[in-house]
Amino acid sequence: MSTLEVTATGAAADAVTTHVPTLVQDRVASRIFAKDHTLWGPAAEDESAKRLNWTGLPRTSRHLIGEVAALREELSQAGYDRVVLCGMGGSSLAPEVICATAGVPIDVLDSSDPDVVRAALTDLDRTVVVVSSKSGSTVETDSQRRAFEQAFRDAGLDPTARMVIVTDPGSPLDNDARAAGFRVVNADPQVGGRYSALTAFGLVPSALAGADVETLLDDAEAVSDLLAADDDANPALRLAAAMAGTQPLRDKLVLVDDGTENVGFGAWAEQLIAESTGKDGTGILPVVAIGAAPASLYDDGTVVRLVATDSESDSDGEQDTSDAGGSASSAASLVTVAGPLGAQIMLWETATAVAGRLLGISPFDQPDVESAKAAARELLDAGIGAGVEPAFTDGSVEVTALGGDWLGDATTVDAAVDTLLGLLDDQQGYIAVMAYLDRLGDADLELVARDLFDRTGRPATFGWGPRFLHSTGQYHKGGPATGVYLQVTT
């Protein structure tokens, strides 16, 4: 394989044949990299005009390499060898996959659970904390920042010497942190959060943890011209067509780790795709598969195999699907993607932007996330926190039903789950499991998604709260109204 390759078969290949020539004719790729904000229609122009700087990040972010290397050396000399990242959504997902792929440790704190936060407040004498928030007002991140500041002070340690702030210039966090004497690194404000992997949000915590961010940028820059080319072979155009151009639309995109060296890549791609496309009643639902993709998903979804860069594909661009899991039919929609992490970040960002054009939506806003944040602030300001009374209690488990009187006669957890699953549309439906628990201590709970695949034959996603609110939450609220939702809290 070349440095970056996308191959397709079945319905995905048909979509490539149908849509790529038009995308080439319309010069979509080159216009994206020229920052043409008119590509997504008049209603999207204002937002798009201030969200396209991600296209040049492989070059414009290079100044961070030396700056962060010097900071890491300074912190290392002071004895700080543990990096904790406080952030949500795009501020945490990219550093997590960058560090996991590089094999360097970083503790990502993207939970508001008091026990999880408390457990992170350890080894303070050797800890540097990176606080990342684009808006500078993310509630979860602000609470984590305050917890660490207080913990450092209680231990007799200076927080300003041990905390690094990453935020947009002029944000509330930027202003407050500078006034208090903290180190501040500003990110490019004309890059959206989910497109920020190659900005300070992705690079600063990753480099402080020891990841080689120069190679990451090198790999991204090496494919930029390829992705900007108005050419049938452009892998981003091919991937976008496979994602958003099947007829009828296969709106479930199943991401299967099939040997890729990019560890945890699916979680980063999940946010990018769901938050970019899930709006106006349409969108692509990314499903991060646990193991091989269930056979039923070949019937109505597109399965993407994330493979190692040394994998082999047929010379005509079609892929070997014999080990993709399940049993592919002749009508299957299958894609194989390979390439180093930096290259794939640019690939998927470009493809998602193109997919937005094919779907007729803006890939750069998140209207339902913003409205949900506003509603939450109103509730907090009003002092409302008691929630809804449970429908019944089964042992120590309280069961609450939202969205109508659908529980019927159910009086047990098992019966309630059965009733919920009975609401699934057997053609278009999906299940979203959301758990406000410890994603490290309760990691095995993710396997429930695979169990629900097997039980219902329908796609099932799993998200840890509250981080899913900054990821798939936009799709849940703004995408097709075909989901049923199972939320687990303590």
Residue ranges and their predicted role:
Residues 82-106, 462, 468-470, 484-486:
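Glycine-rich, small/polar surface segments that engage phosphate groups of diverse ligands
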Residues 305-332:
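Phosphate/diphosphate-binding loops
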Residues 53-70, 95-146, 288-294:
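Glycine-rich oxoanion-binding loops at beta->alpha junctions
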Residues 154-304, 317-319, 323, 338, ...:
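Active-site phosphate/pyrophosphate-binding segments
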Residues 432-467, 472, 477, 482:
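Extended C-terminal subregions enriched in glycine
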Residues 109-110, 132-133, 185-191, 335:
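Short beta->alpha connector loops at strand-helix junctions that form conserved
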